[in-house]
């Protein structure tokens, strides 16, 4: 006999299969069901597939994000500003981990930063892979993350450690082997509850969805970025589309490397073979000894981070500050301290 609770879950899946959108409350209820190991995997797969085929709506992303936040292991940080640079991933371009490096640049200039990230699923190296290769202990606990934010202004939060409930959807996501709503929700579910963020999006069509969801979730400021030729980063190979979210308003514009005072770079120069190469190039770039193309790529993304956090009034000034910090080796010095702190040293 099916109880009323199970029936309500089934009806939500049925609603999706009929092409109807869910309210944020309904989406949160469905997400909570999907994070329950006892909920039927075939219904989980049906719901995820229906959302993907029809196209996820902002309210649905909001509901799923709220459900993940409710289940997260919290990192209790009380500062006025907290930055993240986590994006959706999935661009498949295998470029240097610019958003991870950008987080360190921003933190080295005094912007408190909790970088939320995971291992790679579609690229040669995810943010967690690179941080680990740099010597960082990605498995430290939440209390250490809080101490690091208080003393260094930086920490890295390895997503699986802070979202243990996500284990319940791993088998289904693996079988589907495609992007699902959880890829969109991940950047919006930082367990430290940051209030400013740069969110890279690999598909331009998803930019309004993420921007609207971020607005509904109450962020103070967000830049949703999509760079040529389809990267979830600020690009130095061409134009970057931006949706800027501030106080509930969304503004659309584009920037080029020239607008930031940075050189245009070929995509080939930014590609890496694996996490080892990405980490080594990030290490050299952050110490001011890297390739100029890597420096420009990192500086462009750091500029977005510094601007959204209110460190600089415009993106060009933010890029100049990022380049100066990199050439002075400030992010490398912070990285060294963060690695030691993550290990409890």
Swiss-Prot record:
Keywords: Amino-acid biosynthesis, Aromatic amino acid biosynthesis, Glycosyltransferase, Magnesium, Metal-binding, Transferase, Tryptophan biosynthesis
Binding site for Mg(2+) 2: 232-233
Binding positions (Mg(2+) 1): 99, 233
Residues the entry annotates as binding anthranilate 1: 87, 118
Binding site for 5-phospho-alpha-D-ribose 1-diphosphate: 87, 90-91, 95, 97-100, 115-123, 127
Function of the molecule: Catalyzes the transfer of the phosphoribosyl group of 5-phosphorylribose-1-pyrophosphate (PRPP) to anthranilate to yield N-(5'-phosphoribosyl)-anthranilate (PRA).
Protein name: Anthranilate phosphoribosyltransferase
Keyword Metal-binding included in the entry's annotation: yes
One GO CC annotation: cytosol
